[in-house]
Amino acid sequence: MFEFQELTKPALFTLFGRDVTAYALFLTLGVLIGVLMSINRAKRTHYDVNAALLFPVLAIPLSVIFGRLVYCLCSIVLLLDNGFGFIFRIDYGGFSIMGVTIGLALAALLTAKIEKVSFLDTLDCAVPGLLMALALSRFGEGATMNGTGFEVTVPGLQFAPIARVGLYGESTYAVHMGEALVALIAAV
C-alpha cells in the first residue's frame, strides 16, 4: 500500500465513496457540453457523426493518461515523495495541459485513421467543444486555490473577476478567469 500526501479540497458531496468537488462538476459539465457541441457541429458540417462520437471515447482516457503522466514527470519530487502509485491517484488532481493536448491530438489522429476521415476535419469538429470544456474547467478553478497570479497591490483592482482572495488572504490576480473568458469566446 502506498502512502500519499494528503491534499485538501472542499467536497460538495460524496458519490460512490468519492468526494466530488466544484471543480470536478465544472469540468464534467464542460466535457458533456463539449461533446454535445461536437455532435451538433458534425451534423451541421456533414462530418461523420460516428467519428464525432468516437473522438471523445478516445480523447477522454488518452487526455487523462497523458495529462497525468506529463504532470508527474514535471513534478518528479511529488512522485518520489509519494511513491509510484501517485501516478494513478488522479483524484488528487494535477494534470498538465501539455499532456492533455498530446492525448487529444493522438485521439484525433486515431479517430481519423479508424473512421477514415480527415485529421483536420476531426479537429475542426472537436475544437469548439474542447474550448468549451476548457472554459468551464477554468471557471471551476475558481473553487480551488489554483489559477492565480501575482498579488494585486492596487486597491481599485481588488475585486472579482479581476482578483480573488489567495491562499493566505492576500488579493491575487484571477488568471483562471482570463483563461476561461478567452476559451469561452473562442468556443462560440
Placement of each model-derived feature along the sequence:
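A feature for loop-to-transmembrane-helix boundaries and adjacent hydrophobic helices
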Residues: 1-188
